[in-house]
């Protein structure tokens, strides 16, 4: 599995159910990488998508203990059930796309994290684990410093150390 996430300087990812940032280059990268792949998310992340609908051109799996059946979505009620669902997945990559609790629960099952680091510190109430403080992770590659609408950011790929 691969986690894909945009974080603030303090590893914040969201506030009040919304993303902290809307960066076109980041969204384009997300679409390019995840299209025709499997994406795993929590119930609140699904509800935050446009119309609360699953992402098109992807296999959408929601990890939730209390989600009702929804068209276009497979539901896993536990990590064990999720792992069984994706065991024979033909997708080249399986992406974990949030939110905070799902990232924390599935990070031990990820071999890579594709991170957009935004050099800003808006208030957040959902966070991604600090990979720089975790010796199990190391930076594999990073882009040059980019800027869009006054926000400076980098694409940083982490792999297990």
Question: Where does each model-flagged region fall?
Answer:
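Enzymes that bind and transform nitrogen-containing heteroaromatic metabolites
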Residues: 1-161
């Amino acid at each position: 599995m691969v986690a894909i996430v945009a974080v603030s300087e303090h590893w914040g990812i969201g506030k009040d159910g919304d993303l902290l940032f809307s960066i076109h280059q980041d969204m384009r990268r997300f679409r390019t990488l995840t299209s025709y792949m499997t994406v795993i998310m929590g119930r609140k992340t699904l509800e935050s998508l446009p119309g609360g609908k699953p992402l098109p051109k992807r296999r959408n799996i929601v990890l939730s203990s209390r989600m009702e059946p929804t068209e276009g979505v497979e539901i896993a009620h536990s990590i064990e059930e999720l792992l069984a669902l994706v065991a024979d997945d033909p997708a080249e990559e399986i992406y974990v796309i949030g939110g905070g609790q799902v990232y924390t629960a599935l990070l031990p099952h990820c071999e890579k994290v594709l991170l957009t680091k935004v050099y800003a510190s808006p208030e957040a109430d959902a966070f991604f684990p600090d990979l720089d403080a975790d010796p199990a992770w190391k930076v594999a590659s990073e882009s040059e410093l980019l800027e869009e609408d006054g926000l400076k950011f980098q694409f940083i790929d982490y792999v297990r150390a």
